[in-house]
Protein backbone atom coordinates (compact mmCIF):
# COMPACT_ATOMS: atom_id res chain seq x y z
CA UNK A 1 0.00 0.00 0.00
CA UNK A 2 1.22 3.49 -0.83
CA UNK A 3 1.52 5.41 2.42
CA UNK A 4 2.06 8.70 0.66
CA UNK A 5 5.41 9.13 2.46
CA UNK A 6 8.34 9.52 0.07
CA UNK A 7 11.84 8.31 0.89
CA UNK A 8 14.62 10.89 1.22
CA UNK A 9 16.52 11.51 -2.02
CA UNK A 10 20.30 11.14 -1.95
CA UNK A 11 22.68 12.14 -4.74
CA UNK A 12 25.82 9.97 -4.83
CA UNK A 13 28.86 11.24 -6.73
CA UNK A 14 31.99 9.21 -7.51
CA UNK A 15 34.05 8.79 -10.68
CA UNK A 16 34.71 5.09 -9.91
CA UNK A 17 31.77 3.26 -11.52
CA UNK A 18 32.12 0.18 -9.30
CA UNK A 19 32.13 2.23 -6.11
CA UNK A 20 29.23 4.32 -7.40
CA UNK A 21 27.11 1.25 -8.18
CA UNK A 22 27.87 -0.31 -4.80
CA UNK A 23 26.97 2.83 -2.87
CA UNK A 24 23.79 3.22 -4.89
CA UNK A 25 22.70 -0.36 -4.10
CA UNK A 26 23.51 -0.01 -0.42
CA UNK A 27 21.64 3.26 0.04
CA UNK A 28 18.61 2.00 -1.90
CA UNK A 29 18.53 -1.09 0.30
CA UNK A 30 18.59 1.21 3.32
CA UNK A 31 15.43 3.01 2.23
CA UNK A 32 16.65 5.96 0.17
CA UNK A 33 15.86 7.11 -3.34
CA UNK A 34 19.22 7.46 -5.08
CA UNK A 35 20.47 9.39 -8.10
CA UNK A 36 24.09 9.32 -9.27
CA UNK A 37 26.71 11.45 -10.99
CA UNK A 38 30.17 10.51 -12.24
CA UNK A 39 31.92 13.88 -11.93
CA UNK A 40 31.64 17.22 -10.21
CA UNK A 41 30.06 19.08 -13.11
CA UNK A 42 27.28 16.50 -13.46
CA UNK A 43 26.80 16.57 -9.69
CA UNK A 44 26.33 20.32 -9.72
CA UNK A 45 23.74 20.11 -12.50
CA UNK A 46 21.90 17.29 -10.75
CA UNK A 47 21.90 19.06 -7.39
CA UNK A 48 20.57 22.25 -8.96
CA UNK A 49 17.84 20.57 -11.02
CA UNK A 50 16.58 17.80 -8.70
CA UNK A 51 17.22 19.31 -5.24
CA UNK A 52 18.23 16.11 -3.37
CA UNK A 53 17.81 15.87 0.40
CA UNK A 54 21.50 14.98 0.86
CA UNK A 55 24.65 14.50 -1.20
CA UNK A 56 27.40 11.89 -0.78
CA UNK A 57 30.37 13.33 -2.64
CA UNK A 58 33.85 12.02 -3.44
CA UNK A 59 36.63 14.61 -3.19
CA UNK A 60 38.92 13.43 -6.01
CA UNK A 61 37.01 13.69 -9.30
CA UNK A 62 37.68 14.94 -12.81
CA UNK A 63 36.16 18.10 -14.33
CA UNK A 64 35.25 19.58 -10.93
CA UNK A 65 36.50 18.21 -7.61
CA UNK A 66 34.35 17.69 -4.55
CA UNK A 67 35.51 20.76 -2.65
CA UNK A 68 34.74 22.93 -5.69
CA UNK A 69 31.26 21.41 -5.92
CA UNK A 70 30.52 22.19 -2.26
CA UNK A 71 31.90 25.71 -2.63
CA UNK A 72 29.71 26.32 -5.70
CA UNK A 73 26.60 24.98 -3.96
CA UNK A 74 27.10 27.22 -0.95
CA UNK A 75 27.74 30.21 -3.22
CA UNK A 76 24.28 29.57 -4.71
CA UNK A 77 22.77 29.48 -1.21
CA UNK A 78 22.07 25.76 -1.59
CA UNK A 79 22.29 24.35 1.94
CA UNK A 80 21.76 20.67 1.06
CA UNK A 81 23.65 18.46 3.58
CA UNK A 82 26.86 17.08 2.08
CA UNK A 83 28.94 14.14 3.29
CA UNK A 84 32.37 14.19 1.66
CA UNK A 85 34.25 10.95 0.95
CA UNK A 86 38.03 10.98 0.71
CA UNK A 87 41.09 8.78 1.03
CA UNK A 88 42.85 11.78 2.57
CA UNK A 89 42.80 11.52 6.34
CA UNK A 90 44.98 14.42 7.51
CA UNK A 91 43.53 17.11 9.74
CA UNK A 92 44.26 19.75 7.07
CA UNK A 93 42.27 17.82 4.46
CA UNK A 94 39.33 17.36 6.82
CA UNK A 95 39.37 21.03 7.75
CA UNK A 96 39.50 22.07 4.08
CA UNK A 97 36.45 19.97 3.25
CA UNK A 98 34.44 21.22 6.21
CA UNK A 99 35.46 24.85 5.73
CA UNK A 100 34.31 24.65 2.10
CA UNK A 101 30.84 23.93 3.45
CA UNK A 102 30.64 20.14 3.79
CA UNK A 103 28.60 18.88 6.76
CA UNK A 104 30.52 15.65 7.31
CA UNK A 105 33.80 14.05 6.20
CA UNK A 106 34.21 10.27 5.93
CA UNK A 107 37.62 8.73 5.25
CA UNK A 108 37.96 5.79 2.85
CA UNK A 109 37.86 2.86 3.23
CA UNK A 110 34.70 2.84 5.30
CA UNK A 111 31.92 0.44 6.24
CA UNK A 112 28.73 1.13 4.32
CA UNK A 113 26.67 0.95 7.50
CA UNK A 114 28.62 3.93 8.85
CA UNK A 115 27.87 5.97 5.73
CA UNK A 116 24.17 5.11 6.02
CA UNK A 117 24.18 6.20 9.67
CA UNK A 118 25.89 9.48 8.80
CA UNK A 119 23.44 10.24 5.99
CA UNK A 120 20.53 9.56 8.35
CA UNK A 121 22.08 11.89 10.92
CA UNK A 122 22.37 14.65 8.32
CA UNK A 123 18.75 14.12 7.30
CA UNK A 124 17.55 14.18 10.90
CA UNK A 125 19.07 17.63 11.26
CA UNK A 126 16.86 18.76 8.39
CA UNK A 127 13.81 16.87 9.63
CA UNK A 128 13.81 14.26 6.87
CA UNK A 129 14.34 10.64 7.92
CA UNK A 130 14.39 7.43 5.95
CA UNK A 131 11.49 5.10 6.56
CA UNK A 132 13.81 2.56 8.18
CA UNK A 133 15.42 4.87 10.73
CA UNK A 134 13.23 4.25 13.78
CA UNK A 135 14.86 5.27 17.05
CA UNK A 136 14.25 1.89 18.71
CA UNK A 137 13.25 -1.26 16.84
CA UNK A 138 11.49 -4.08 18.70
CA UNK A 139 11.36 -7.72 17.63
CA UNK A 140 9.72 -9.84 20.31
CA UNK A 141 11.79 -9.46 23.51
CA UNK A 142 14.60 -7.76 21.58
CA UNK A 143 14.96 -3.97 21.49
CA UNK A 144 17.60 -2.37 19.26
CA UNK A 145 18.40 1.27 20.03
CA UNK A 146 20.10 2.40 16.82
CA UNK A 147 21.28 5.90 17.87
CA UNK A 148 22.40 4.67 21.30
CA UNK A 149 23.97 1.50 19.85
CA UNK A 150 22.40 -0.66 22.56
CA UNK A 151 20.60 -3.97 22.37
CA UNK A 152 18.38 -5.41 25.11
CA UNK A 153 16.61 -8.73 25.52
CA UNK A 154 13.79 -8.68 28.07
CA UNK A 155 15.13 -5.33 29.27
CA UNK A 156 18.64 -6.64 29.91
CA UNK A 157 21.56 -5.12 27.98
CA UNK A 158 23.38 -7.48 25.63
CA UNK A 159 27.14 -6.92 25.29
CA UNK A 160 27.92 -6.71 21.56
CA UNK A 161 31.08 -5.83 19.68
CA UNK A 162 30.98 -2.97 17.18
CA UNK A 163 30.65 -5.33 14.21
CA UNK A 164 28.02 -7.47 15.93
CA UNK A 165 25.91 -4.39 16.57
CA UNK A 166 26.40 -3.14 13.00
CA UNK A 167 25.06 -6.46 11.70
CA UNK A 168 22.17 -6.50 14.17
CA UNK A 169 21.24 -2.91 13.29
CA UNK A 170 21.00 -3.72 9.59
CA UNK A 171 18.89 -6.81 10.27
CA UNK A 172 16.67 -4.83 12.64
CA UNK A 173 16.14 -2.00 10.16
CA UNK A 174 15.02 -4.63 7.64
CA UNK A 175 13.18 -6.88 10.10
CA UNK A 176 11.00 -9.57 8.50
CA UNK A 177 12.91 -9.05 5.22
CA UNK A 178 15.32 -11.79 4.14
CA UNK A 179 18.74 -10.31 3.33
CA UNK A 180 21.27 -12.28 1.31
CA UNK A 181 24.86 -12.78 2.40
CA UNK A 182 25.98 -10.45 -0.39
CA UNK A 183 23.63 -7.71 0.81
CA UNK A 184 24.84 -8.06 4.40
CA UNK A 185 28.48 -8.03 3.31
CA UNK A 186 27.88 -4.83 1.40
CA UNK A 187 25.93 -3.08 4.14
CA UNK A 188 28.02 -4.14 7.14
CA UNK A 189 31.53 -4.89 5.90
CA UNK A 190 31.76 -2.60 2.88
CA UNK A 191 31.83 -2.91 -0.87
CA UNK A 192 35.46 -4.07 -1.07
CA UNK A 193 35.04 -7.09 1.23
CA UNK A 194 35.70 -10.54 -0.27
CA UNK A 195 32.40 -11.93 -1.51
CA UNK A 196 33.28 -15.60 -0.91
CA UNK A 197 33.89 -15.26 2.82
CA UNK A 198 31.82 -17.00 5.51
CA UNK A 199 32.12 -14.02 7.86
CA UNK A 200 28.36 -13.37 7.77
CA UNK A 201 27.59 -16.90 8.97
CA UNK A 202 30.20 -16.58 11.71
CA UNK A 203 28.76 -13.32 13.04
CA UNK A 204 25.19 -14.61 12.79
CA UNK A 205 26.36 -17.41 15.06
CA UNK A 206 27.83 -14.92 17.53
CA UNK A 207 24.56 -12.96 17.61
CA UNK A 208 22.45 -16.09 18.09
CA UNK A 209 24.47 -17.16 21.11
CA UNK A 210 24.05 -13.73 22.71
CA UNK A 211 20.46 -12.91 21.74
CA UNK A 212 18.92 -16.34 22.15
CA UNK A 213 20.72 -17.41 25.32
CA UNK A 214 18.92 -19.14 28.19
CA UNK A 215 16.41 -20.86 25.90
CA UNK A 216 15.10 -17.56 24.56
CA UNK A 217 12.89 -17.48 21.46
CA UNK A 218 14.47 -17.88 18.03
CA UNK A 219 15.05 -14.42 16.53
CA UNK A 220 17.63 -14.95 13.80
CA UNK A 221 16.50 -17.31 11.07
CA UNK A 222 18.40 -18.85 8.18
CA UNK A 223 16.41 -19.08 4.96
CA UNK A 224 18.19 -21.84 3.10
CA UNK A 225 19.66 -20.74 -0.20
CA UNK A 226 18.61 -17.13 0.35
CA UNK A 227 20.03 -15.51 3.49
CA UNK A 228 19.04 -14.38 6.97
CA UNK A 229 16.11 -12.59 8.58
CA UNK A 230 15.35 -11.12 12.01
CA UNK A 231 11.84 -11.97 13.20
CA UNK A 232 9.95 -13.87 15.86
CA UNK A 233 9.36 -17.59 15.32
Swiss-Prot record:
It is found in: Cytoplasm. Keywords: Cytoplasm, DNA-binding, Phosphoprotein, Transcription, Transcription regulation, Two-component regulatory system. Pfam families: Response_reg, Trans_reg_C. Disulfide bonds: none annotated. Residues 9-123 form the Response regulatory domain. One of its GO terms (biological process) is regulation of DNA-templated transcription. One of its GO terms (cellular component) is cytosol. InterPro entries: CheY-like_superfamily, OmpR/PhoB-type_DNA-bd, Sig_transdc_resp-reg_receiver, WalR-like, WH-like_DNA-bd_sf. GO terms for molecular function: phosphorelay response regulator activity; transcription cis-regulatory region binding. Residues 134-232 bind DNA. SUPFAM superfamilies: CheY-like (SSF52172). Its main location: cytoplasm. Phosphorylated by PrrB at Asp-58. The modification 4-aspartylphosphate is found at residue 58. Member of the two-component regulatory system PrrB/PrrA that is involved specifically in early intracellular multiplication of Mycobacterium and is essential for its viability. Upon phosphorylation by PrrB, functions as a transcription regulator by direct binding to promoter regions of target genes to positively regulate their expression. Autoregulates its own expression. This is Transcriptional regulatory protein PrrA. The lineage of its organism: Bacteria, Bacillati, Actinomycetota, Actinomycetes, Mycobacteriales.
Amino acid sequence: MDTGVSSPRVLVVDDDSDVLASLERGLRLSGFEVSTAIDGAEALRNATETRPDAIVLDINMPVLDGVSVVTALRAMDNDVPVCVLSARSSVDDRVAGLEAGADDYLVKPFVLAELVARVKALLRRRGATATSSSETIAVGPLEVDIPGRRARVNGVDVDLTKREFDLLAVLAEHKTTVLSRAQLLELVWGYDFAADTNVVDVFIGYLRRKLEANSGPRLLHTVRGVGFVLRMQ
